[in-house]
C-alpha cells in the first residue's frame, strides 16, 4: 500500500520554494500602497484547514503588517460578526482553495454588502468565491494527484494558503511603512528559507514519527495537539490530519487552555503533542509540559528544525503530519474512512452540504 499522505508531505519543501516568488508578486499586484494604508482592521476567515491557516497567520499580519487582525471561522464571521463590522477600514479575506465552500462565500458576500473591501485566497479566478469578492489572490498549487484516485488529506493546499497569507502580510507591511524595504526583503528571505527548514525537519522527524506510530499502534483513545499563537493553528490543523488520515479522535488545544481543561481528563497516558516555537510560547509551554508529565501523559515532541515563530506553522506541522501518515498506513485505515458509513464526497460534501448549504443574504 502506497503511503500517499506521506508522499504529499515530502513535496512540501519544494512547494514552498516554487510558490514563494510568484505569491510575493501576486500580493504586490493586489495590495498597492493606498489599499494597504486603508486597512483599519483585517478579518480572515475560512472553514477547516483554511480557518486554521487564518489563525496561523494572524501574528504575521499584526507583527509584520502592523494591522489589527481577527481570524474567525466562516460560520462565526458570516452569521455573527459581519453585521457589526467597522463602518470604515474593514478588509476581509476569505480563504478557500476549492473556492466552493458555501459558508466562506456567504461571509465575504455579506461583508461586501456592508461596505468592507473583500478578497479571496483561492485556486483560480473562476471559483465561486472569486466571483463573490472584489480582489482575488490565486494560489495555483493543487494537491499532487495519484494514479489510484485516492482522496488524500490536504497538506499542499494548506501550505499554499499560508504562503499567500505570509507574502501578503510582508508586502502590506512594506506598503504601510511598518517594514522598511530592507526589512521586507529580509523577511521574504526568511520565508523562503523555510523550504530548507521544512526539508531538514522531514529528515529529522520521519524516522521518529514512524517509531512513535509503531509504539502507539495499540492506543485507541484520544490524541491531543497543543500549541499557542501561530501554532494554535498548527495544533488544530494537525488534529484535523489525524482525524482525516486515521479516524482517531483528535483535538487541537491552546497550551494555556490545556491547563484549564485537559489537565482534568481521566485517562493518564493520552498522547499529547506539545508544538512550541520556543519564543513567545516558551515559558508557558515548559510549565504545562511539567504538568503533563506529572499526571502521566505521553508527552510527544518530535524533532524539528528551528524557525521564527511567525512562520513556524510551515515547519511545526510536518512532524505530527508524518505521525498521522505512518499511523494510518500501519493501521491499514482508509483516508476519510473511504467516505463510507453514510459519508459521501458527492453532491457538495454529501449530507454535510459543505458546498450546497443554504446561503444567508
Could you say what each language-model-derived stretch is?
Residues 25-28, 37-193, 228, 263-264, ...:
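Glycine-rich phosphate-binding loops that contact phosphosugars or nucleotide phosphates
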Amino acid at each position: 500500500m502506497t503511503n500517499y499522505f506521506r508522499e504529499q508531505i515530502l513535496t512540501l519543501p519544494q512547494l514552498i520554494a516554487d510558490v514563494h516568488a510568484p505569491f510575493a508578486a501576486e500580493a504586490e499586484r493586489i495590495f498597492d500602497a493606498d489599499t494597504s494604508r486603508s486597512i483599519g482592521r483585517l478579518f480572515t476567515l475560512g472553514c477547516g484547514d483554511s480557518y486554521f491557516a487564518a489563525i496561523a497567520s494572524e501574528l504575521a499580519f499584526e507583527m509584520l503588517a502592523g494591522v489589527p487582525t481577527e481570524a474567525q471561522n466562516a460560520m462565526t464571521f458570516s452569521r455573527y460578526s459581519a453585521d457589526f463590522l467597522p463602518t470604515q477600514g474593514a478588509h476581509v479575506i476569505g480563504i478557500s482553495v476549492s473556492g466552493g465552500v458555501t459558508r466562506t462565500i456567504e461571509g465575504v458576500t455579506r461583508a461586501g454588502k456592508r461596505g468592507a473591501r473583500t478578497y479571496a485566497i483561492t485556486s483560480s479566478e473562476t471559483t465561486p468565491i472569486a466571483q463573490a469578492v472584489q480582489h482575488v489572490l490565486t494560489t495555483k498549487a493543487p494537491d499532487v494527484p495519484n494514479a489510484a484516485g485516492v482522496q488524500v488529506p490536504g497538506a499542499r493546499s494548506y501550505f499554499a494558503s499560508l504562503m499567500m497569507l505570509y507574502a501578503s502580510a510582508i508586502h502590506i507591511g512594506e506598503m504601510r511603512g511598518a517594514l522598511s524595504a530592507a526589512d521586507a526583503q529580509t523577511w521574504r528571505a526568511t520565508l523562503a528559507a523555510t523550504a530548507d527548514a521544512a526539508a531538514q525537519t522531514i529528515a529529522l522527524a520521519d524516522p521518529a514519527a514512524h517509531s512513535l506510530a509503531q509504539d502507539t499502534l495499540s492506543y485507541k483513545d484520544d490524541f491531543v495537539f497543543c500549541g499557542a499563537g501561530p501554532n494554535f493553528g498548527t495544533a488544530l490543523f494537525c488534529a484535523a490530519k489525524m482525524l482525516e488520515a486515521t479516524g482517531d479522535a483528535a483535538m487541537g488545544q491552546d497550551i494555556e487552555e490545556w491547563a484549564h481543561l485537559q489537565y482534568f481528563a481521566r485517562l493518564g497516558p493520552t498522547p499529547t503533542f506539545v508544538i512550541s516555537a520556543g519564543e513567545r510560547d516558551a515559558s508557558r509551554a515548559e510549565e504545562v509540559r511539567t504538568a503533563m508529565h506529572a499526571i502521566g501523559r505521553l508527552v510527544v515532541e518530535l524533532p524539528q528544525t528551528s524557525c521564527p515563530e511567525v512562520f513556524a506553522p510551515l515547519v511545526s506541522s510536518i512532524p505530527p503530519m508524518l505521525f498521522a501518515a505512518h499511523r494510518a498506513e500501519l493501521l491499514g485505515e482508509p483516508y476519510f474512512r473511504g467516505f463510507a458509513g453514510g459519508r459521501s464526497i458527492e453532491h457538495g460534501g454529501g449530507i454535510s452540504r459543505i458546498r450546497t448549504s443554504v446561503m444567508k443574504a
